[in-house]
């Protein structure tokens, strides 16, 4: 199977987000890459589901809480930017302070 670099990156996000979700369900706190992967995946899927950029910017800050991540991780993530595919094209979604509470 031949994948473009963009397709490889998306596949890596899916795998990392799946691992993060499983660890979170087991009660483990997520590290930096796991937290970023899970938020990124949810934003990408939200775009595919037809949500707007504004909706995703708000939703992105509700996916994880400080209790879901290891100490210091929330402070390390100032923003997450995702180039997502919407029904009307590709757009940049930026979530500032994605882990707020």
UniProtKB/Swiss-Prot annotation:
CDD domains: Urease_gamma. Disulfide bonds: none annotated. It catalyses: urea + 2 H2O + H(+) = hydrogencarbonate + 2 NH4(+). Pathway: Nitrogen metabolism; urea degradation; CO(2) and NH(3) from urea (urease route): step 1/1. Its EC number is 3.5.1.5. Keywords: Cytoplasm, Hydrolase. Pfam families: Urease_gamma. It is found in: Cytoplasm. GO terms for cellular component: cytoplasm. It comes from the Bacteria. One of its GO terms (biological process) is urea catabolic process. GO terms for molecular function: nickel cation binding; urease activity. HAMAP family: Urease_gamma. Belongs to the urease gamma subunit family. Heterotrimer of UreA (gamma), UreB (beta) and UreC (alpha) subunits. Three heterotrimers associate to form the active enzyme. This is Urease subunit gamma. It comes from Geobacillus kaustophilus (strain HTA426).
């Amino acid at each position: 199977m031949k994948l473009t670099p963009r397709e490889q990156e998306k596949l890596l996000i899916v795998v990392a987000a799946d691992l993060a979700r499983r660890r979170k369900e087991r009660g483990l706190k997520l590290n930096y890459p796991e937290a970023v992967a899970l938020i990124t995946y949810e934003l990408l899927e939200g775009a595919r589901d037809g949500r707007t950029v504004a909706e995703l910017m708000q939703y992105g800050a509700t996916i994880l809480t400080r209790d879901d991540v290891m100490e210091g991780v929330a402070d390390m993530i100032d923003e997450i930017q995702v180039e997502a595919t919407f029904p009307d094209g590709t757009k940049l979604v930026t979530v500032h302070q994605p882990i707020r509470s």
